[in-house]
Amino acid sequence: MNFFIIDKKEDLLGIVLTHAHEDHIGAVAHIWPYLKCKIYATPFTAALILEKFKEKKIEISSYLEVVALNSKIKLGNFEIDFVTLTHSILEPHGLSIKTPLGTVLHTGDWKIDPNPLIGSQIDEQKLKSIGNNGVSAMICDSTNIFSPGRAGSESEVRDSLLRIMEIKTNRILVTSLSLIHI
C-alpha cells in the first residue's frame, strides 16, 4: 500500500466524510487498517461505512463517530462545522473548518437544488454567514461547474424518467450512480 497519509498517520486526527457516495467512502475500509484512526460521518454515511467494514470482517464501531446533522466537532486545533448541502444522496455536508490560521470551506460534492428529492435544502444562510466571517481557502467539487446556466433539479430528472416509463410498453433498463432519481 503506497499512500502518503500512511507515512503521516501520527499527525492524523481522523477521517471526516462529507457523504456516502462510493467515490468518497470506497477506499476507507482498505486504508483504515493502516491508520486505525477515528472516522466521523453522519448517520446514513456511517451506516454504509459499517457495512463496508463488515464485508471485510473488520470491527470499527469503537472508532466510528456518528455526527448529528448540522453539528460541530473539534479535532485538535480544528473546529469542524457540518453544513447541509444538496446532492444526489442522503445527508451531504460541506465542512467549515476553523483553523488557527483561518477558515477552510470544503464542500464535498454538491449542487444548489431548490427541490431536492431527498433530504433538506441547502443551508444558504449558514454558507452566507461562513462567507461573511471570512474564508481563507475553499475546496470545491461540483459536477458540470463549467457548464453555463443553472443545473436542473433532481426532481426534473425523476419527472422525465417517469414520463418516459409511462409511454414505453416494452422493457426499460435504467442504470444510475445514484438511484434517488427514480
Predicted feature locations:
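His/Asp/Glu-rich metal-coordinating catalytic cores
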Residues: 1-14, 21-180
